């Protein structure tokens, strides 16, 4: 098992915090976002880690990682960044992580152990967090519907009702070589322009429409997404509450507890 962190973007909604470095190097709760991701992945006993760089690539140099580059980071989207790591995706099962999220190592462990060619983690306890982040949580949330067997049924559409959202996609997934082959086959059918602008949830929905099975792993909190300076302020405040369900931090001796 390997891990790939998608860190090519600037994070324009972070304001001037990303003038000099990419979003993943934003300081949060005493570490950078990237540090939190690397620590969680390593605590889940995954040692081979690659980072896909783009904006201000020279600033991303943590020890023990290899690099892939997306030189077109400014004109492409997340799926194009993922494809820059195809060398790994073709050979081994890979945990894929966005670079603007933090999460408990146990979520990574559960994802790594779950069967399936394409598997995604999702948060069943998303609504309280989104209600804190947004005046109307539905302004940002997207549909997430499951089949009776727990596989993904649909994802990524706008909605005006909470009943269309059975969980929040987290930006954390696992892809096997066979799963990546299915993704590559789909991407070959798309125009270059559509490929360049394809986001991850749109890719997942297209895969579903092609008949691809996507398995899911539920979690209840213990992660969060940092998308703005407002998020940073909110989370720094919530970390003072011992009962905050989305506190992702862990004691190194208690990861497997």
Where are these regions (language model features)?
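A structural signal for short hydrophobic beta-strand segments in well-ordered beta-sheet cores
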Residues: 25, 144-146, 216
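Conserved N-terminal catalytic core of the sugar/cofactor nucleotidyltransferase
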Residues: 2-5, 13, 27, 31-96
